[in-house]
Amino acid sequence: MTADRWTQAVREQLGIGRLLPLGDARDGAWIAERAAEAVLAGAVRRAPGVRLGRLRIALADPEDAEESAVPAPPSALPFGPLRVTAEFAATASRPLPATAALLRETLATAAAQRLGLTVSDVDLRVTGLLDEDAAEQPAGEEPELPPQARAEDGDAGVVAAAARAVPGVLRLTGTLGRPVHLEEVPGEAALTHRHVRLEVAVAADHRSRDVARAVREAVGAALPDRPTVAVVVSAVG
């Protein structure tokens, strides 16, 4: 890899943020923090009289988190309920507690129904009041999907084909390196087995957790040795 390509890869990896757990430890799936935040912010844009500020998603209780049943990708958080923290400004057209309740419900619903995140807490902080004329949310930019990953061959090609055939998969991406990563990992009784990590962009009209689960099943069945599989959702678009 040239210096320019290495620099670009590092920037892309830093840009997607941490990897948030999708589902529970048995699911073996994560979503890029940036992708999850974009979906939640997009849901809030349709809420009347409120403008979202800084948004953050993190483990609600790191000490109570559970390690994944499969090898985790770099920068992946362990599994456990998440806390969404958000700042917002609102108009005075309704009481602030009512606006906060609407915003809390909007964020929690989008996290659960559109992504499949397990959110236990939504913490909000009011940062200011908006004039009625300024209350309209600025139009959000269309999510920029990572570039289509290059074609794979061999077993990686088999994995890629199985993943692309799953409904809801837009493309394979490579922000963490190669789109399909195969490796030998230690198993029980000092035996090794193969592990597959792959990265996908998911359609916005499909629940990310469900797509990731279907990808894991398809990839696991596509190879005769039935490797363990981890799926990273890098973008939702």
Please provide the spans of the model-predicted regions:
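Extended, hydrophobic interaction surfaces within ordered domains
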Residues: 80-134
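Short edge beta-strands and adjacent turn/loop segments
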Residues: 47-89, 123, 127-131, 171-201, ...
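C-terminal interaction module
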Residues: 157, 165-168, 172, 182-206, ...
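Surface-exposed beta-loop interaction hotspot
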Residues: 113-170
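Extended, well-folded interaction surfaces typified by the phenylalanyl-tRNA synthetase beta subunit core
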Residues: 1-37, 50-64, 147, 171-177
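Short, non-transmembrane amphipathic alpha-helical segments
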Residues: 40-43, 95-115, 207-227
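Short, hydrophobic beta-strand segments
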Residues: 16-27, 80-91, 140-147, 192-204
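Short secondary-structure junctions
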Residues: 45-53, 115-118, 165-174, 222-227
